């Protein structure tokens, strides 16, 4: 990353996968408590040219991600769903970004991007939701079911990073549809994958912590003081819908066993 505010000076190095989401053109990047805006990204040269700015918002990249399961190492049933882990191929493209205001998390703008698609082989933990599992939530529309699963992904990422004691950016989250001749209807997979080529050994331990992950997400969401979702639990309500938080809790209640008492959580 090169600061062009006064002179062309290298001020930081960022891993390439992270640079695509954090150093795209017009991104706001925080370095040593100072804000920088990316003026230009040299994709081939692996350089980002930034200028010092002061603004009241940050940027959040919008990506389109597909995950294909290459090999399942292990799996087990989970209250009508299935938990598993294995090797996957992740295809990801950054297609835009949002401007989010500090403190209020208000979306104050957006922009389009067209970065090349990236392919990565890594390892992933996932939950598979058969059509029969989702159909039991008769009070939810198909869109609300999708929003609920997206909200779960946000909560799972937070809890997983605490359980694994890693940076949340070390984990990628993607909601994809499982397609095969055996599958009939919409049967999504919610992936939490290692955000590094080849994986860094997070998926197998997370698979072993499935019960803690589910219980932790349920406690996190239910104990959050927000009304309809926030970045601290299921994500902003504008992204998961007005019922996204409650719908996510309904799914977690089934996964954990409805009526089980909530246990205190340290986060």
Task: List the model feature ranges, each with a label.
Residues 1-23, 27-33, 39-267:
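Extended, highly charged accessory segments
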């Amino acid at each position: 990353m090169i600061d062009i505010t006064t002179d062309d000076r290298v001020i930081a190095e960022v891993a390439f996968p992270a640079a695509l989401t954090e150093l795209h053109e017009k991104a706001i990047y925080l370095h040593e408590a100072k804000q920088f805006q990316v003026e230009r990204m040299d994709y081939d040269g692996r350089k980002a040219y930034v200028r010092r700015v002061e603004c009241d918002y940050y940027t959040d990249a919008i990506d389109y991600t597909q995950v294909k399961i290459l090999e399942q190492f292990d799996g087990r049933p989970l209250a009508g769903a299935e938990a598993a882990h294995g090797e996957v191929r992740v295809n990801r493209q950054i297609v835009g970004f949002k401007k989010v205001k500090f403190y209020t998390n208000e979306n104050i703008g957006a922009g389009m991007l067209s970065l090349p698609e990236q392919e990565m082989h890594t390892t992933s933990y996932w939950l598979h939701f058969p059509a029969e599992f989702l159909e039991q939530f008769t009070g939810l529309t198909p869109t609300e079911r999708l929003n609920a699963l997206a909200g779960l992904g946000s909560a799972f990422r937070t809890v997983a990073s605490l359980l694994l004691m890693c940076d949340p950016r070390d984990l990628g989250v993607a909601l994809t549809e499982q397609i095969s001749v055996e599958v009939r209807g919409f049967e999504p997979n919610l992936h939490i994958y290692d955000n590094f080529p080849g994986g860094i050994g997070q998926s197998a331990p997370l698979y072993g912590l499935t019960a803690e992950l589910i219980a932790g997400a349920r406690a996190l969401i239910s104990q959050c003081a927000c009304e309809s979702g926030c970045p601290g639990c299921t994500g902003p309500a504008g992204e998961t819908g007005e019922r996204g938080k409650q719908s996510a809790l309904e799914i977690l209640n089934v996964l954990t066993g409805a009526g089980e008492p909530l246990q205190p959580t340290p986060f």
